[in-house]
């Protein structure tokens, strides 16, 4: 039986840094794994085009899904459009090891269907204020890894990383989280280590 690729869902609100994280992961992992990406946008393929422009992967390894309406539905209640994209990539690239599925920007209640994602990363950003972790919601409380992004902006918006740390621990219990800054690469190594460890990936 052919083994199925690990599917990693990357969710979070609009502008939190999901696409920047997806790009960084592609650049770091494309030499190690047989890798592809599915992106979700409501009415365009902007995120997919951004990844292609920045040469994250070969264009044929990136599929942009236009969800229409609510992006939450396309990753949860009716994930068929995304599942079809995953199947298409599996057919196109036999031996695929890893597929990153980036959701469209959504609210704190968004979660991935277990049919679509084996591991979930949820990205929030400091610029939205240090109260975000304590607001809870499935993404913050139940994702496999919470990524608190854009920590360089904390002084500019008056956000306390200490408060965010305390609240994330309280809301998530034993579930891990990481502070990151995609501009400098801070936190990226921890995110990759988490994906490899939890997804049982072994680099070629």
Curated annotation (Swiss-Prot):
GO terms for molecular function: ATP hydrolysis activity; GTP binding; GTPase activity; nickel cation binding. Homodimer. UreD, UreF and UreG form a complex that acts as a GTP-hydrolysis-dependent molecular chaperone, activating the urease apoprotein by helping to assemble the nickel containing metallocenter of UreC. The UreE protein probably delivers the nickel. The keyword tRNA processing does not apply. Keywords: Chaperone, Cytoplasm, GTP-binding, Nickel insertion, Nucleotide-binding. Pfam families: cobW (PF02492). The gene is ureG. This is Urease accessory protein UreG. GO terms for cellular component: cytoplasm. One of its GO terms (biological process) is urea catabolic process. SMART domains: AAA. It is found in: Cytoplasm. GTP binds at residues 12-19. It comes from Pseudomonas paraeruginosa (strain DSM 24068 / PA7). The keyword Lipid biosynthesis does not apply. CDD domains: UreG. HAMAP family: UreG (MF_01389). It comes from the Bacteria.
């Amino acid at each position: 039986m052919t083994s199925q690729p690990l599917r990693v869902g990357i969710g979070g609100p609009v502008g939190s840094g999901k696409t920047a994280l997806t790009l960084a992961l592609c650049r770091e992992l494309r030499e190690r794994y047989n890798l592809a990406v599915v992106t979700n946008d409501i009415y365009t393929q902007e995120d997919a085009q951004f990844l292609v422009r920045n040469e994250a992967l070969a264009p044929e390894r990136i599929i942009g899904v236009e969800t229409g309406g609510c992006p939450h539905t396309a990753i949860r209640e009716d994930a068929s459009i995304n599942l079809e994209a995953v199947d298409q990539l599996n057919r196109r690239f036999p031996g695929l090891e890893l597929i990153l599925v980036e959701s469209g920007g959504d609210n704190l209640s968004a979660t991935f269907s277990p049919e679509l994602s084996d591991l979930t990363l949820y990205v929030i950003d400091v610029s939205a204020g240090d109260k975000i972790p304590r607001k809870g919601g499935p993404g913050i409380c139940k994702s496999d890894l919470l990524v608190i992004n854009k920590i360089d902006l904390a002084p500019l918006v008056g956000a306390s990383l200490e408060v965010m740390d305390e609240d994330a621990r309280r809301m998530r219990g034993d579930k891990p989280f990481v502070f990151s800054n995609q501009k400098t690469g801070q936190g990226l190594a921890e995110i990759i280590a988490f994906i490899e460890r939890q997804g049982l990936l072994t680099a070629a």
